[in-house]
Every structure is written in C-alpha cells, then in structure tokens.
Swiss-Prot record:
Protein name, per record: Mast cell protease 1
Disulfide bonding pattern of the chain: C50-C66, C143-C208, C174-C187
Active site (record annotation): H65, D109, S202
Protein species of origin: Meriones unguiculatus (Mongolian jird)
Signal peptide: 1-18
Entry EC number(s): 3.4.21.-
Amino acid sequence: MQALLFLLALLWPPEAGAEEIIGGVESKPHSRPYMAHLTITTKQGFTASCGGFLINPQFVMTAAHCKGREITVTLGAHDVSKKESTQQKIKVAKQIAHPSYSFYSNLHDIMLLKLQKKAKVTASVDVISLPSPSDFINPGKVCRAAGWGRTGVTEPTSDKLREVKLRIMTKAACKNYEHYDYNFQVCVGSPSKIRSAYKGDSGGPLVCAGVAHGIVSYGRIDAKPPAVFTRISPYVPWINLVIRGK
C-alpha cells in the first residue's frame, strides 16, 4: 500500500473505484477474515474491482463510488486468482449508497451492500467491529489498510491480499484537497513515507486496534500521501438504520 488513493472516477468508469496498496507487505493468509473482494459490472458493461469488509453476516461496507450495475462479493479470499476452499461468493441483492454522497466532492463516500444470503461465519470469514458515533481517531495513531489493489503506480493489481501501516495525519496535511472535511473524512499517510492505498483498494477498511475506522476513498493520481478516507463514526446511526431495514 504505497500509493495514494485517487478518485476512481478519473481512472475507472464512474460506477466503480479502485485504490491500491503501495509500500506494504503480503498479508498472512486469512488473517483478516472481514475482507471482501468486489467484482463489479459497471453500467457500461466493464468489469472493475473494489475492496470492502463484512460488518454483519448479510452486509458488506465499501465506498459509494464502487457502485455498479451488478456486484459479486468474494469473502474468505487470500489469492483472488484461485478458487480457495475458504471462499464464499455471494451476489449483492441491494446497493445502498449514502443519500448525501457526492460524486463531485466525494463526500459521504460510503455504501452498504446487502447480500442475497447471509455469509457463513468461519475461521476465514467473520465480521469486524465498527466505532461508536463519538469515537474519533486522533492524528498520530498508526493503523492498517489492506487490499488487492496495485502495488505501484505503474504496477498491476495484486492477486494476493496485501496490507500497509499508515499514520493518521492532521487536517492541515490534507489542506490541498479542495473538498476535504475533517468531520467526515480522515487524512491518512505520512508524506515522508512511500506508503498508501491505490487503484483497486477503494472501499477497503482502515483498521485501528481491531476496529474499522475508515474506508479507502481517494488521493492523488501519483499516489503520493496523504490520502483521504471516509470517517466511519459519523455514519454509525445511519448504518444501524439500514441494517435494521428502516
């Protein structure tokens, strides 16, 4: 995860996003059982991919810019190029993007995917905890992001899950992003490090002490940190309403 997240809209069809892991390492197989790989068919008929994470046996969280005509979720995967016995492939029944999501500003870049059936919880497939609405991660904290995205600006996407350590930055570090909003977004990745999420990682989680605090959203086209992640805590009340079917 070295590269910065870039607005997928600029590189992929607008229905799908993709950021990658640059400067990271291969994850221990199945050590992140909440990770989801999304195969997306766009409205134009192209195929794209995003990351996501299981927050409930029937709901996966991802970025709103990963929306497509159809999405299939693969859970329990390490190497997405192989048919692993741990994998569960489930089609998405409903894509629920946040009602205030803006394609132009990329604010409220969060979406819930309701699966056609509940995932079977196993050693390789499990949910991850979310923060409380008042839980704000502070600058200086080191968290991790994971995904199957590119391992470099000119490199292909990775078949195997990779992860990277990223530092939470102050809002001043993201001042050059015109629409950055500290209340709803997290500034992630030290400019002094060649580490980030990049194309293919969009929608994946930012995990701090075992809790999903952010969602890979966007960054610079040259993958230079910091990048912008959606902050999850302000959306917890909305998330709970969606899961309850309200």
